[in-house]
Amino acid sequence: LNETIKGVMQLNKKIPIGYIPAGTMNDFASAIGIPKDMPAAAQKIVDGSLVTVDIGSFNQEYFTYIAAFGVFTAVSYATDQQLKNSLGIMAYLVEAMKEYQESWQKYHMTVKYDDVVIEDDFIFGMIANSMSVGGIKGLAGSDVWLDDGIFEGVLIKYPKNLAEFHMTLNALA
């Protein structure tokens, strides 16, 4: 989907895209009402029902679902497909625990939005246009619309001590 969107955006034309989901969680497909069943998804394309969604960009790279950095961002790619098939969302948690055992890299950033400036170290950040991320509903907020021109942002600060570390883990659980 991402490569298709990138190609269409480079054409600088509004062209409808048909999408048949093939992932484990299929958050984006669920958000726009596409069934997980491939023949049913294909039929929805044939029927021609259109959904408009916002497209974000970073340095000529486009996204419609999520752009993220930091801890756990490689989990969906690193998780074994057979494990995903048998355990579903739990497979991601198993992989996340493996990654948790490695050191968390921190990213020093200055973030500006509206009249607010935040400068700190972060272990995770994402810009999302989705009602759920990795099957977890509400992570990007509860008032999410895919075509409102607004992307939701989530930042998780780097824990500076053991108490903050435990609070971070509890918030992620």
In which residue ranges do the predicted regions lie?
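Short, solvent-exposed amphipathic alpha-helical segments in soluble enzyme
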Residues: 9-10, 80-81, 141-144, 169-172
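Catalytic core of DAGKc-family lipid kinases
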Residues: 2-127
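Short acidic/glycine-rich loop or secondary-structure boundary segments that cap or lie
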Residues: 73-75, 119-121, 132-136, 161-165
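Short glycine-rich, flexible loops that bind phosphorylated cofactors or substrates
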Residues: 1-2, 134
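Catalytic phosphate-donor-binding core of small-molecule kinases
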Residues: 47-48, 96-107, 147-173
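Gly/Ser/Thr-rich active-site loops/lids in small-molecule metabolic enzymes
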Residues: 83-90, 132-137, 141-162
